[in-house]
Amino acid sequence: MTGIVELDLRMLKKKTAMSKRTVLNENYKGIVESMSIPAEIHERNGKKYASVGSILPIHCCPPEELERRAESTHHYCGVFTDELLAPLEELAYVRLDENTAEKVFINRAKRILIVSSDGHLAQWRCAPTFESANRYIAGTPIVDQRGGVISVVVAKKNNHYAVSSFEGEGGYFESTQNWKVVEPAAGGYAYGELTFPSRTALREHVAGLRGGAGAWGDAVPVLRGGTSPRLALVLDGRQLAHYYLHNVIVDVEYL
């Protein structure tokens, strides 16, 4: 009987320790250092995510909180926060558990495009990255050497994680709509979320659009992928804004 109790206690301790991790892998990789970074672990729709204070990824926020948080947050793409985040430096520390963190180097040359919608703003940012073989969950805190929160994990491409901050090319559209991601069609001429086989067909489409415009808040932000990625804002079929993006990864995984 004692053996069973001891086994149960060991399993409970292991489960408790696992629950405090902000990585999915058990064996930590990279440069691991002793560092205490607070975080709370949550679960929504069967997926774990973390938060630190008021800071959490927008795409993890429960729907009933979106409108409330959008009114009061500072506008970092992909991140809700009631406080200003610490500025980005050359080094950062990414939380592994309550006692350890991975030391990483910020890469400003390799950038990931992240987008977010909170019901008020549709934001985009060409974010710097860090590389790690660890499998972090969304919301994992990223801090500077003094423990100030720089950002939280939002998205990645393979082993490269985006670091959302005020650094990097970015902006926003005032829109209540979510981003629409469009896969590029082979050849043709892009306009908003559509692709036309010829310039003549494109001109005919534009000429046929009605003169009046709907409410600006109904405009749809569009991300077109491919080798020549671009952003657009579309209202009633009319392209109101169009941005070409260069040297940025757009095919990313939101955690």
Swiss-Prot record:
GO molecular function: 2',3'-cyclic GMP-AMP binding; nuclease activity
Signal sequence coordinates: none
Its job: Nuclease that cleaves 2',3'-cGAMP.
Membership in a protein family: Belongs to the poxin family. Highly divergent.
Keywords, comma-separated and alphabetical: Hydrolase, Nuclease
EC number(s) from the headed UniProt entry: 3.1.-.-
HAMAP family given in the database record: Poxins
Designated name of the protein: Poxin
UniProt cross-references to InterPro entries, sorted A to Z: Poxin_vir (IPR006853)
Top-level division of the source organism's lineage: Eukaryota
Reactions that this protein is recorded to catalyse: 2',3'-cGAMP + H2O = Gp(2'-5')Ap(3') + H(+)
